Amino acid sequence: MTAQDLSVHIARWLDSLPLQAGSKLVLAYSGGVDSEVLAYGLSEYAKQRPDLRYQLIYVHHGLSPNADNWAKHCQARAAIYGLPVTVERVQLILGPRVSVEAEARKARYQAILPHLNPQDILLTAHHEDDQLETILLALKRGQGPKGLAAMGQIQPLSLADKGSCLQVRPLLDISREMIETFAQTRQLVHIEDESNQDDKYDRNFLRLEIIPRLKARWPSIATTASRSAQLCAEQQAIVETEVSERLPKLLVKAPVTEQTVLKLSELAAQPIEWQGILLRGFIESQEFSLPSYVQLQQMLQQLIHAKEDAKVHIRINDCVLRRFAGMLYLDSGETLSTALHITARDLHQEILTLLTQASAMVEDKIVPFALVTTGPRLRLPKADEVVSLGYGLPGQFRCQPHFRDKGRELKKLWQECAVPPWLRAEVGFLFYNDKLVMAFGLWVEKAFCAQGDEIGLSYLIANP
């Protein structure tokens, strides 16, 4: 391909996408030579497809004294291209051991994502040399096939609650030299970020010091490295397919919380090379950041090989891993207040309203209460009974659940009902006057069960 063909190449790429009338093509636009070329190609394509919507987004990081001028450059160029442009200003949160590159990239995506819907396409101007940088960085970090697969030309991009859209890199198989030649031929004006010359940043070091020497020795190394990345991506796809078949067999719903947990005995029974892969798959399926290889090995050692009564509590990135009753629980580590909460109102006529309000104290979920005439259920309060809600009862508190003939201390019932220690302070208890009548999700006190076909209140999850 010659530089003259580059705009045709961009148009063909865009034509291959699942575009529909009203879809929006959004370009992450920095004003650098790569995104300038892609912005030009997008403007040419817009003449062919006026039924689509277009948007350029420049993210102002505030890191350079030239950033305001760059924003003005992008606005001026967008006017020449006849494309709408948005300037998004972000503020980076920096500190010790925080990567400026990583934080800037994170901030860019956070600024751009609100502009996207599932039918839209995000375009980024990564090229073949960027791909080589990504592969070399993955090697430096000791990553496996997933990391070495680097960037795909088409990848899904999560939009959180809105679903996902596609992220497309039309220039990923185009060399930096070809992009620069095209820009010169079309006399495209672009900015030069002075920070690109600072080799304290890993990508700049590779771009300035390493890749030129590699290409001088092996001119096609960026192309062949991209081929290796594609092969790694294919291998990773096979692994992920296998994980999608194996992992569900290791998962169950936990008592009380009904969250998905991993059966550690089943994980330990897997071939050793699959244990780490499946654990990573479980963490990823719960939408937490993935651990490093070293962290993963340490986690496996503690989760599988520690003594059965050992307390396992591991914090990795944004995830807390806990072992209880042979199960692996994952959560964000953000717990509710463990202080005693009591609400009391004389509203026997409004008990369902009370309990719905109280549900705000139970993991911010709507508590699944129901009025039923069968099964274990709580009789409704009498006219002279005050309903109250409590948390954090002492372990010596004596209870008699509907499924027991005799009373038992709460600390024993926690174990019997398989309630993890870190969740016990968050289980709500319902009282009529000063008498315990229900433990949410666990039991109804035997003396307060509805009788015969009498209507009663049910909120039971665990089945001891």
UniProtKB/Swiss-Prot annotation:
- Where, in this chain's numbering, is ATP bound? S30, G31, G32, V33, D34, S35
A single Gene Ontology CC term: cytoplasm
Tree of life domain? Bacteria
The record, for Pfam families, names: ATP_bind_3, TilS, TilS_C
Which principal EC class is assigned to this enzyme?
A: ligase
SUPFAM superfamilies, from UniProt? Adenine nucleotide alpha hydrolases-like, MesJ substrate recognition domain-like, PheT/TilS domain
Q: Which SMART domains match?
A: TilS_C
Which biological process terms from the Gene Ontology are attached to this UniProt entry?
tRNA modification
Q: Which reaction does it catalyse?
A: cytidine(34) in tRNA(Ile2) + L-lysine + ATP = lysidine(34) in tRNA(Ile2) + AMP + diphosphate + H(+)
Q: What is its EC number?
A: 6.3.4.19
What does its UniProt record remark on the domains? The N-terminal region contains the highly conserved SGGXDS motif, predicted to be a P-loop motif involved in ATP binding.
State the protein's purpose. Ligates lysine onto the cytidine present at position 34 of the AUA codon-specific tRNA(Ile) that contains the anticodon CAU, in an ATP-dependent manner. Cytidine is converted to lysidine, thus changing the amino acid specificity of the tRNA from methionine to isoleucine.
Kindly give the HAMAP family that the UniProt entry links to this protein. Answer: tRNA_Ile_lys_synt (MF_01161)
What is this protein called in UniProt?
tRNA(Ile)-lysidine synthase
Species this chain originates from: Shewanella oneidensis (strain ATCC 700550 / JCM 31522 / CIP 106686 / LMG 19005 / NCIMB 14063 / MR-1)
